[in-house]
């Protein structure tokens, strides 16, 4: 079995990594998905096509408000 991890960052960049072991894929994903700059991530079981882990993060960008 092989597993593919996809991470999408705030700036639109994305990275993928492939792992042969589920435990390794999940360990790396759990560590990476805690980064605040990750907006989306998933671990996909390549053989079955099943997404076994997923994270979505919505960001609100602060707007500067100037008072006179």
Q: What are these language model-derived features?
A:
Residues 20-31:
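Charged, amphipathic alpha-helical segments
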């Amino acid at each position: 079995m092989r597993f593919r991890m996809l991470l999408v960052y705030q700036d639109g960049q994305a990275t993928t990594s492939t792992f042969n072991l589920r435990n390794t894929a999940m360990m790396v994903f759990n560590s990476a998905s805690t980064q605040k700059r990750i907006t989306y991530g998933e671990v996909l079981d390549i053989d079955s096509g099943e997404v076994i882990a997923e994270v979505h993060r919505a960001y609100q960008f602060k707007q500067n408000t100037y008072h006179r």
